[in-house]
């Protein structure tokens, strides 16, 4: 029997001679192996949307939040007509102008990001179907009935098995193909249609991530919305160097899971140290609480250079492309485990495990695509290599740091090439005198990109020098991070739905993204701390979730130890890895469905319209750097959720900014078209520094649906943070005070005095049930 095949035939061939039918020529189609889709909810208008299907919704958003372009290059070099200069109104040989070219590059970035997550999810689902079967159930327990809110809304599919996730990924891959084809020379020519396609790519990215995370949650028995998920050890200082150390870098949990399985089966969990960097670190700690998290990707080069790891396992995404060179310098062994990162290595997958171990001990690196073999190979190699490297020195000692610093000519190229313009030259000048104050400061804030080294005319190992000083002076690099809990439970949504929609909970702040921070990880923790204290709900994923854990209060406690892991006011929720960003969007969708009874199935625009107008949530990608982050942010934007980027986010080339004037909405209760406050004011915007970011958050959590009490709550926080960080009232406060009822009682006198100075007038009317779908 072949699944999904159609059989067509002439029914006359089936008739016996006893049956007389004149001109009977009937075609019939018989479907094998596919069950009828369960009618769990009436199908909405847009299941499996194609590129143009939601274009009307995109254009509604783009009319209110037109793209603002910041070209970092005026040239187009994508075809052999070029390179074409698009500055000063010029067109390229194909006819594109600079606006369309910038939008095209944004689309390409979003397609790369979406393809990355779709490829990751496809690998997971394919591997898990191979090992567990296509009928393996998707069961998140009794407390989660809406298990796949994005899939339900976008595709109309309610996935019940791993096999159902294949259908979702088939759709994702089809859409990515069409989207990427639109970026070819001589295809799309309008910047707004490029943006609509970028928004579509972002939505596909969101959907692909949900498929991948659902698969790994059910297959590896990861936490299923557990607010009391275990606290995991985090930081350089928690790694036990007396044991063989295996370091996993990347995003794919499969190789790491086999290492943990081999250790458990052979009762060696306490003999070998397993740790991780980036999202693989988060996901292996969702499988078991034994592994440890070194930190976000900003700590990758420093930790590898430290020489602690005996075996380095790389899978996919956000891995330094020179990782092989860096690992071999330390005498460690590298195993590449994913087809997306082969690093020019010999494929040893066909060998048996003992042969592979021998090969690695001789050659120090190999490509091993059979993940089932990674467990034994990594552990046994680590045990041997750890003995070989026991006394190996990989970093200069402090005296050598001084001698190296003396070679510095203080030319200043390091400062100029640093993405954050850190004072590397000044740290060198102090180190010449044996004063490491500059390097101590650098260690806390440095991203570890290595650009200072790349441009140094004396070839000084600046990152290694910084790492050594950090190791010597920071003895307590031990933190705690709550393991990624996955989705938000339905009962939590029922508890917070009304307070969020009406504004009594002032907002949901989602801290996500990479670690290209302008000033170190602590700024992410400071943002989280500020809004936890103000009883916002704070959710986190990926590198941001790790960064939040890398700060302690005066009592030595991290934010994860101080605040509960529940999705409630004052709760700090670590959803998990990059894939787990889907649960943040999913929570907003579930508010629309569980609280407001908005149907999900194939009903994207209505759900997104509800979120835009009623769910006070904002994403903060303070260290966003990758194409994946671009796709994540753009996907969130299509749902109607605003995003704040760090200062490096301007390099994505495009923001969605309103003009700050009044918006128009329709009140569904009266049918009137009303002019209202600009809420939320922008859809994606950058902040120059952390103070500016903190002050943007309360403003971007405002929604037209806020009750007077809820809006007063949000205005209180907006005014309070502005006075705290800038010592004055917000310069645009008058835009967001609709009537006197919106003014918090304890601030009424000073706010009224300010409004009188501004010539403020109350809105005559504001909507009870706002929508932009008219």
Curated annotation (Swiss-Prot):
Q: Which GO terms describe its biological process?
A: acetyl-CoA metabolic process; nitric oxide catabolic process; response to hydrogen peroxide
Which is one GO molecular function term here? iron ion binding
Q: What cofactor(s) does the depicted protein rely on? A: [4Fe-4S] cluster; [Ni-4Fe-4S] cluster
- Binding of [4Fe-4S] cluster 4: at which residues? 418, 446, 449, 452
Which SUPFAM superfamilies would you find in this protein's record?
Answer: alpha-helical ferredoxin (SSF46548), Prismane protein-like (SSF56821)
The residues that the entry says bind CO are 117
UniProt signal peptide: none
Organism's domain of life? Archaea
Q: Where does [4Fe-4S] cluster 2 bind?
A: 76, 79, 84, 94
Positions with a binding annotation for [4Fe-4S] cluster 3:
408, 411, 414, 456
Q: Which InterPro entries match?
A: 4Fe4S_Fe-S-bd, 4Fe4S_Fe_S_CS, CdhA, HCP/CODH, Prismane-like_a/b-sand, Prismane-like_sf
The enzyme's E.C. designation: 1.2.7.4
The note on the cofactor says: Binds 7 [4Fe-4S] clusters per heterotetramer.
Q: Where is the 4Fe-4S ferredoxin-type domain?
A: 398-427, 436-466
**Where does the chain bind [4Fe-4S] cluster 1?**
73, 77
List ligand-binding residues for [Ni-4Fe-4S] cluster: 251, 279, 318, 514, 543, 578
Identify the NCBIfam families for this entry: cdhA
Instruction: Outline the subunit composition.
Output: Heterotetramer of two alpha and two epsilon subunits. The ACDS complex is made up of alpha, epsilon, beta, gamma and delta subunits with a probable stoichiometry of (alpha(2)epsilon(2))(4)-beta(8)-(gamma(1)delta(1))(8).
Question: Tell me, what does this protein do in biology?
Answer: Part of the ACDS complex that catalyzes the reversible cleavage of acetyl-CoA, allowing autotrophic growth from CO(2). The alpha-epsilon subcomponent functions as a carbon monoxide dehydrogenase.
Which family does the similarity line name? Belongs to the Ni-containing carbon monoxide dehydrogenase family.
Q: Which PANTHER family match?
A: ACETYL-COA DECARBONYLASE_SYNTHASE COMPLEX SUBUNIT ALPHA, HYDROXYLAMINE REDUCTASE
Q: What is this protein called?
A: Acetyl-CoA decarbonylase/synthase complex subunit alpha
Organism of origin: Methanocaldococcus jannaschii (strain ATCC 43067 / DSM 2661 / JAL-1 / JCM 10045 / NBRC 100440) (Methanococcus jannaschii)
Taxonomic lineage of the native organism: Archaea, Methanobacteriati, Methanobacteriota, Methanomada group, Methanococci
């Amino acid at each position: 029997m072949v699944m999904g095949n159609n059989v067509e035939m002439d029914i006359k061939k089936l008739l016996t001679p006893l049956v007389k039918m004149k001109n009977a020529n009937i075609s019939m189609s018989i479907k094998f192996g596919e069950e009828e889709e369960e009618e769990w909810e009436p199908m909405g208008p847009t299941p499996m949307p194609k590129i143009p299907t939601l274009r009307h919704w995109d254009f509604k958003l783009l009319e209110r939040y037109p793209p603002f372009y910041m070209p970092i290059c005026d040239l187009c070099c994508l075809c052999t007509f070029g390179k074409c200069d698009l500055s000063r109104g010029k067109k390229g040989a194909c006819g594109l102008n600079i606006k369309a070219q910038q939008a095209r590059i944004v689309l390409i970035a979003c397609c790369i990001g979406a393809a990355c997550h779709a490829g990751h999810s496809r690998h997971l689902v394919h591997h898990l179907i191979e090992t567990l079967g296509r009928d393996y159930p998707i069961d998140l327990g009794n407390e989660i009935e809406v298990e796949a809110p994005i899939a339900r809304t976008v595709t109309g599919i309610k996935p019940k098995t791993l096999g159902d996730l294949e259908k979702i990924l088939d759709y994702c891959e089809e859409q990515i193909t069409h989207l990427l084809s639109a970026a070819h020379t001589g295809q799309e020519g309008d910047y707004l249609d490029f943006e609509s396609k970028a928004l579509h790519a972002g939505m596909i990215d969101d959907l692909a991530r949900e498929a991948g995370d659902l698969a790994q949650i059910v297959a590896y028995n990861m936490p299923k919305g557990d607010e009391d998920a275990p606290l995991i050890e985090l930081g350089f200082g928690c790694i036990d160097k007396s044991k063989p150390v295996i370091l996993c870098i990347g995003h794919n949990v499969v190789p790491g899971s086999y290492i943990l399985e081999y250790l458990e089966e052979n009762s060696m969990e306490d003999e070998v140290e397993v740790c991780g960097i980036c999202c693989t670190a988060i996901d292996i700690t969702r499988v078991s609480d034994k592994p440890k998290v070194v930190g976000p990707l900003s700590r990758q080069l420093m930790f590898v250079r430290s020489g602690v790891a005996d075996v380095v396992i790389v899978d996919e995404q956000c891995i330094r492309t020179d990782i092989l060179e860096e690992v071999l310098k330390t005498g460690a062994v590298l195993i590449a485990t994913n087809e997306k990162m082969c690093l020019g290595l010999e494929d040893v997958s066909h060998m048996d495990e003992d042969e592979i171990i021998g090969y690695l001990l001789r050659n120090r690196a190999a490509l091993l695509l059979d993940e089932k073999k990674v467990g034994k190979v990594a552990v046994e190699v680590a045990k041997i290599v750890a003995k070989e490297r026991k006394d190996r020195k990989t970093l200069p000692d402090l005296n050598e740091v001084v001698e190296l610093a003396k070679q510095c000519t203080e030319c200043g190229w390091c400062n100029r090439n640093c993405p954050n313009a850190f004072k590397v030259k000044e740290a060198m000048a102090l180190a010449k005198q044996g004063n490491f104050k500059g390097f101590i400061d650098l260690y806390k804030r440095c991203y570890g990109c290595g650009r200072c080294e790349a441009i140094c005319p004396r070839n000084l190992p600046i990152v290694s020098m910084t790492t050594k000083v950090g190791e010597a002076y920071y003895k307590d690099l031990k933190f705690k991070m709550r393991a990624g809990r996955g989705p938000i439970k339905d009962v939590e949504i029922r508890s917070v739905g009304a307070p969020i929609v009406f504004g009594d909970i002032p907002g949901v702040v989602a801290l996500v993204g990479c670690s290209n921070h302008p000033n170190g990880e602590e700024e992410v923790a400071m943002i989280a701390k500020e809004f936890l204290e103000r009883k916002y709900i704070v959710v986190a994923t990926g590198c941001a979730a790790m960064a939040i854990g890398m700060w302690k209060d005066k009592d030595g406690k991290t934010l994860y130890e101080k605040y509960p892991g529940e999705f409630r006011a004052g709760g700090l929720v670590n959803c998990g890895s990059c894939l787990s960003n889907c649960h943040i969007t999913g929570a907003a969708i579930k508010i629309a469905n569980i609280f407001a009874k908005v149907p999900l199935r194939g009903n994207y625009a209505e759900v997104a319209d509800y979120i835009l107008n009623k769910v006070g949530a904002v994403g903060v990608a303070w260290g966003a750097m990758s194409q994946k982050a671009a796709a994540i942010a753009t996907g969130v934007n299509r749902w109607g959720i605003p995003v704040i980027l760090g200062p490096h986010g301007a390099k994505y080339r495009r923001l969605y900014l309103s003009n700050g004037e009044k918006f128009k909405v329709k009140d569904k209760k009266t049918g009137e078209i009303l002019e209202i406050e600009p809420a939320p004011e922008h859809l994606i915007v950058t902040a120059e520094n952390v103070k500016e970011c903190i002050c943007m958050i309360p403003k971007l959590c405002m929604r037209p649906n806020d009750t007077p009490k809820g809006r007063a709550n949000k205005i209180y926080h907006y005014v309070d943070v502005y006075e705290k960080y800038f010592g004055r009232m917000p310069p645009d406060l008058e835009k967001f005070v609709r009537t006197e009822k919106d003014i918090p009682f304890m601030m009424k006198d000073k706010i009224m005095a300010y409004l009188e100075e501004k010539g403020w007038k109350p809105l005559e009317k504001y909507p009870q049930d706002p929508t932009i779908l008219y």
